[in-house]
A protein has these predicted regions:
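A conserved mid-domain beta-alpha-beta active-site/ligand-binding segment of alpha/beta enzyme cores
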Residues: 558-608
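Short internal beta-strands
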Residues: 77-84, 249-254, 387-391
Length: 626
């Protein structure tokens, strides 16, 4: 087990470093790799690195490339072994891990081809066992792996060691978990195209590396990260086996660390600062833990949970309970744009000016409706000037089957009057031909991507219109990082920032709503937020910015914890039903578990458990300040 260095890490069974963001963590990790390479070179030996794929290591690989290009770090004597490969994919397949590594790292540094090792996704089935044994032997032949880089999947897997993998497992062929395949669906233009099997290093293979580093970014990884670091070692979470390794560490950004005890319940691992925010977090946690409304908490319950110091400040639980309850109660408002001519002292949003110009930014179509569809409708109905701006077209989420359906409808319609509709016939026929030529896994031609974007654009427009937004106030920016890229191959550039900045400068809004602040920085949502942040900071100090409030919502991600919420907008049963009807406008791609409204209902149930008024559902927001 890796050593812990402070009381704050008392619950952690793997040494964990928390960084402000993913680039900072990646830079620290890359600097250590540099030292390893130089140290092994000084010994006359080659550094042996175990590498991972997916979006998590992308910032790390970009930093290694920078070290090579700008600081002269050579990789010409480094040996690499990758964790895994999809079974059935050729090395030149657009989603093969061999191609991923070439595009993300190998093609940009001076690593020798003969020193690169990945499992072969096309080895015949009757040769898989020998191929896996040979892979193990190749690792042993170079003296083992000095440093193994790992990510962690939503099921807690490292490599493709899905739940149930043994601690002693070796390199092998195995079936992929349904959650893993769903997560990869957008990469393969639909879950049906995701390979069902992969060849992966085993947990035992991974644990033989001399050093292990697991990296995780974004709030969606927080819960599984905490289970791996603080929970028991279990085959249900293969990453938990790192706990028994003598030199394993985790590198996290703040969002990925959110469920760790030292982040979530800091008073249990050391002296708390007891700021107003931390006090609120502690009292709400205690109420939910004791399954009591806030106003019913007693002195003894504070003492039993290590929170006696709070009582020394407030005297009795009675006074503390009232203060925290009032703060939580005041987050609730049916007027997200501010209630005109009302005392706004205790309201989350100011009354004036009224009406407000409101800008809703959605990194991908549907983010806005999922995260705040009910709030959008309230803002419109209460007289505000609401603009919705989609940063990307969302075409990468659309399957070929949807494009075929639309192309066939267009073709059959145009064929009714072929003389007048020749261009439409040519376009539809071209789409169908493009899909046939590229097959299920090829890169989509620009024409096909345009059609898919139009499909998604139509759904987004229908959804926004159903919530009352004017057609003239629905914008599609089609940011270049998305139109010219693909998942895990996005690069934010000046043109993206300029486009977002132009919208801000044109509208000069009083309110902005957006998401992506807790997302993986390589994701569309993370990059969308980064584009906004850069555009905002480029205009820092403009008079309109001083009067603009930025509210953060959650899109596809899990909802805020109650202590994080600064504005809670309640929805009636009818309002929730109307929101869900808008969500269902997105017929080409919608995750089934987002169609029932349970996320918003659960937030309302949590507020109810804390003792506030009972609502059908609640949409939650936090304020962002630059």
């Amino acid at each position: 087990m890796s050593a812990r260095t402070s009381p704050a890490e008392a619950f952690e069974k793997i040494a964990t470093l928390i960084f402000v963001d993913a680039p900072a963590a990646a830079a620290a990790r890359a600097a250590e790799v540099r030292e390893l390479i130089l140290a092994r070179r000084a010994e006359g030996k080659a550094a042996v690195l175990g590498l991972a794929t997916g979006s998590t290591p992308v910032p790390f690989y970009r930093e290694l490339i920078r070290l090579h290009r700008e600081e002269g770090l050579s990789f010409n004597d480094v040996i690499t072994f990758n964790l895994d490969e999809y079974y059935g994919l050729s090395r030149d397949h657009r989603e093969s891990y061999f191609r991923f590594m070439q595009e993300q790292l190998f093609a940009h540094i001076d690593l020798k081809p003969e020193n690169i090792h990945l499992p072969d996704g096309l080895v015949p089935l009757d040769g898989v066992f020998k191929h896996c044994a040979d892979y193990e032997a190749s690792i042993s032949a170079v003296g083992g792996i000095d440093l193994q880089i790992l990510g962690i999947g939503r099921t807690g897997h490292i490599g493709f060691n899905e739940p149930g993998s043994s601690r002693d497992s070796l390199t092998r062929l195995l079936p992929l978990d349904i959650v893993t395949r769903q997560d990869a669906a957008s990469d393969f233009f639909g879950e049906a195209n995701v390979p069902r099997f992969a060849i992966t290093m085993g947990v035992g293979t991974i644990l033989r590396a001399r050093k292990l580093v697991m990296m995780a970014w974004g709030g969606n990884k927080a819960e599984i990260v905490a289970r791996a670091i603080e929970g028991p070692e279990t085959e249900a979470v293969s990453a938990s086996f790192l706990q028994s390794h003598p030199d394993a560490r985790c590198f996290l950004d703040r969002a990925a660390s959110a469920a760790l005890t030292r982040t979530r319940l800091p008073w249990l691992v050391g002296r708390a600062e007891w700021t107003p925010a931390e006090t609120r977090r502690a009292v709400l946690w205690l109420a939910l833990t004791e399954k009591k409304p806030v106003l019913k908490l007693r002195d003894g319950e504070y003492n039993e949970h290590g929170m006696a110091e709070l009582l020394t400040r407030y005297g009795k639980a009675y006074h503390l309970n009232i203060e925290v309850f009032n703060r939580q109660q005041h987050t609730i408002t049916g007027w997200p744009g501010g209630k005109p001519n009302a005392d706004d002292t205790s309201r989350p949003e100011r009354a004036a000016p009224f009406p407000k110009t409101v800008l809703v930014l959605a990194p991908e179509p549907q983010d806005d409706v999922l995260g705040m569809g009910g709030t959008v409708e309230r803002l419109v109905n209460q007289g505000h000037d609401v603009h919705v701006c989609y940063l990307t077209g969302g075409d990468l989420r659309i399957t070929d089957a949807e494009a075929i359906r639309f192309a066939r409808v267009l073709l059959e319609t145009a064929e009714q009057e072929p003389a007048r509709w020749k261009e439409q016939i040519d376009f539809a026929s071209g789409i169908l031909n493009d899909i046939e030529i590229k097959g299920p896994f090829g890169d989509p031609p620009a024409r096909l991507r345009r059609l898919k974007a139009l499909i998604r654009r139509g759904e987004a427009r229908d959804a926004a219109l159903s919530l009352g937004v004017k057609a003239s106030q629905i914008r599609f920016l089609d940011l270049p990082f998305y139109t010219g890229g693909r998942y895990r191959q996005f690069h934010l550039g000046p043109a993206d920032i300029t486009a977002v900045g132009s919208v801000l400068a044109t509208l000069r809004p009083h309110q902005i709503y957006l998401t992506g602040h807790l997302a993986d920085p390589s994701s569309v949502q993370g990059l969308g937020f980064a584009a906004f942040k850069a555009a905002w900071e480029a205009r820092d100090g403009q008079p309109w910015q001083e009067h603009c409030r930025v509210w953060l919502y959650r899109g596809h991600q899990s909802e805020y914890e109650p202590h994080e919420i600064q504005m809670a907008v309640p929805l009636s049963p009818d309002q929730l039903a109307h929101k869900l009807a808008a969500v269902r406008k997105f017929q080409s791609h919608t995750l089934p578990d987002l169609l029932d409204g349970n996320r918003n209902r659960q937030t309302a149930r949590t507020y109810d458990a804390l003792g506030t008024a009972e609502y059908e559902a609640i949409e939650a927001f936090r304020r962002w300040q630059s």
